[in-house]
Amino acid sequence: MEPTAAPHPHLYLASQSPRRQELLRQIGVRFELLLADGDEDAEALEAVLLGETPDDYVQRVCALKAQAAARRRAARGLPARPILTSDTTVCLGGEILGKPADAADAHRMLRGMSGREHRVLTAVTVVTADGTPMHALSVSQVRFAVLTDVDIARYIASGEPFGKAGAYGIQGRAAAFVAHISGSYSGIMGLPLFETAALLAQAAITL
């Protein structure tokens, strides 16, 4: 008997985040990673523009990631399939909290969020196989318990804050800090599944 060929991926995922990969698998999406080359300047892509609001920022960066991924797919001569990108940012008041530069920066962010509510914004872009972009935005509110300096120091020592917007991951040890959330848990993790599934349906992707 001939072996059954593996089904084609539904889309390209232009993200190296293990959390986004896990969430896509959770809803049955088959994907192929479409990661950036070493010469692509991700830091320049994520720079905040003067006067930019957190909502505008996260949507602009997500759309730019999608444009870069589409160029990457074309340059590599890959088959035309939809592309999915996502970007998450945390904001406290009007301040955008990106990925911490170091332990001191992580401490500053966590201390600022202690006992307070902050917003987590995750933008999603799906570019269809014919190049049509579609966008969605998930906004959630998260309230932290009051954190002691010991709480913060232990969390930073775990290494978990680094590489994460707002210096924490809700799916990890920081779950113990979260007193209340309103919104999308998967969006806080990095990919809002309700909004993502709606975009995939618009792109005629059947899961």
UniProtKB/Swiss-Prot annotation:
Q: Name one GO molecular function term.
A: UTP diphosphatase activity
Q: What are its GO biological-process terms?
A: nucleotide metabolic process
Site entry (Important for substrate specificity), positions: 19, 88, 171
Provide a GO CC annotation, any one. cytoplasm
Tell where it localizes: Cytoplasm
Q: Does the keyword Glycoprotein apply?
A: no
The UniProt function text for this chain reads: Nucleoside triphosphate pyrophosphatase that hydrolyzes dTTP and UTP. May have a dual role in cell division arrest and in preventing the incorporation of modified nucleotides into cellular nucleic acids.
What's the name of the protein?
dTTP/UTP pyrophosphatase
- What organism does the UniProt record list as the source? Ralstonia nicotianae (strain ATCC BAA-1114 / GMI1000) (Ralstonia solanacearum)
Taxonomic lineage from the root? Bacteria, Pseudomonadati, Pseudomonadota, Betaproteobacteria, Burkholderiales
